[in-house]
Amino acid sequence: MEYWFRYGVTEIPIEVSEEISCEKISLYRGFEVDYKILSEIAGEVGRKSGEVTILYDHEHQTQLELLRSLLYEIQSQTSLEGRVKIIFSSWRTSPRIVEEILKSSLKGFSCKIEYVEDCKKTSYTGLKTPVDVLESDTRILVTSILPHGLYRYPSIVNSLIYSKLIEKEEDVDVHSILEDKLQILGLCIVGEKTYLDSLTNLDKSSIIEAEKIYTVNLEPVDILIADAWGWPWDSTLESTLHILRLVYKGVREDGMIGLIAECKEGIGRREFAEKLFKIYEENIQDSYIEIVREVLRNRRVGMVTTLPRTLLENTLHIKSFDTPQEFLKYSLRIYSKNARIRIVNGPILIE
């Protein structure tokens, strides 16, 4: 039986003999734009003459489709020229990659695009926020919710903080400021649906819905092979390691996890790379390194990746492979052909 994994911008296969017990779970989901919701927003923008600021916290491709559809809908009702500015960030993947994606995907729209770290910011009732947010008539957040190994299901407000679209300077009620004073409207994808609401209501309803969609209870198997969702999530080692915590409960103690992640852009941020190379020289504290340590206490981990084998094996004790087939051959030598195997595609949190 042949199975496929997302790997960068492409897919790579694995062949599992029918003699071996193997099951597959996939939570890649389709997405249909809710134009009724987008028309409602566009109508609101059309009734006003001031500027529009869209805060965009990038997480996945369907979210980009939602942003494009929103801009099309606004453009069909009013001119975008000089009115719309997109302030973007992403704490999940490289902002440089997100910038390339946005500029390529939004070429046909007359809107400004700026990375949040390059924005002029100011203090406002205990928060530090881009000046454009304060000066706009309409403020929209385009976001989504997927499971993450560090935070399970991060709230929308916490995601804004992680991505530095807002920064807390004082101990204040962030929800109240964003909703009552700044009146930021939230447009959020969860699974196949789009939700439009206040940030407070979205935080409650969207996390509950995401948990229903992406959290599953599964019996542990001997070998679990999971992709890291493809580009841009698997662009660096740093951005993929959280997957281990999402899936490790689906593997028995002393079992083995295979993570399929291209890591085309290398290790990740310089700060993370420095910690990785000093991992045995001093008491390194890093959330992603701790995930690996936690999983390796009673499980084996291998990676199919372009990263050098010696890098992974000498720092994190993760064995590296060139193909999923090579990983499978190695793991079956350890667990035999009687091993139970699980293939995992897409965002999933195994309990």
Language-model segments: what does each one mean?
Residues 37-104, 225, 238-274:
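N-terminal active-site beta-alpha-beta segment that forms phosphate/nucleotide-binding
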Residues 22-48, 72, 205-215:
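Short N-terminal or domain-adjacent regulatory/targeting segments
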Residues 76-79, 83-88, 240-241, 245-351:
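C-terminal non-catalytic interaction/assembly regions of soluble proteins
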Residues 98-121, 280-282, 287-298:
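A glycine-rich helix N-cap at a beta->alpha junction
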Residues 33-37, 202-218, 235-242, 283-285:
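A general structural motif
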